[in-house]
UniProtKB/Swiss-Prot annotation:
Catalysis: reaction(s): L-seryl-[protein] + ATP = O-phospho-L-seryl-[protein] + ADP + H(+); L-threonyl-[protein] + ATP = O-phospho-L-threonyl-[protein] + ADP + H(+)
InterPro entries: Anti-sigma-factor_SerPK, Anti-sigma_F, HATPase_C_sf
Biological processes annotated in GO: asexual sporulation; negative regulation of sporulation resulting in formation of a cellular spore; sporulation resulting in formation of a cellular spore
Keyword Nucleotide-binding: yes
Originating species: Bacillus cytotoxicus (strain DSM 22905 / CIP 110041 / 391-98 / NVH 391-98)
Superkingdom classification of source: Bacteria
Record-given protein name: Anti-sigma F factor
Keyword annotations: ATP-binding, Kinase, Nucleotide-binding, Serine/threonine-protein kinase, Sporulation, Transferase
A GO term for molecular function: protein serine kinase activity
Keyword Glycoprotein: no
Amino acid sequence: MRNEMNLQFSALSQNESFARVTVAAFIAQLDPTMEELTEIKTVVSEAVTNAIIHGYEGNPEGIVYISVILEEAMVKLTIRDEGVGIFNLDEARQPLFTTKPELERSGMGFTIMENFMDEVEIISNESFGTTIHLTKYLSNSNALCN
């Protein structure tokens, strides 16, 4: 059985933890392992932080959109912003690359997403924002939404 949740919130750094916890609570019905849940929470944190810091460049008037779809033992996340977009996506996906070194960012966001998720697709257009599609296949077959 398919179950879907949509969430939108202001691009404020304090909303990152709200997004992480809300997504984790929704996914809990699939009975993920603690490792899987931690990985998904980390990925949500990275993607939301990227939207706030890089997409909207700290402008709190921006909106971050999250969609979560649960199907059997699969989680599909979409995290989207309508910010400035990514100038060079290939460069941005390189480990340690950051456009904000003055903020002491590690530049590992996309690398973490690619390591923790089974599928990662990033679509970005300058001046039109970025959409990140993430898929995780859970190892536990005792999903409650089946």
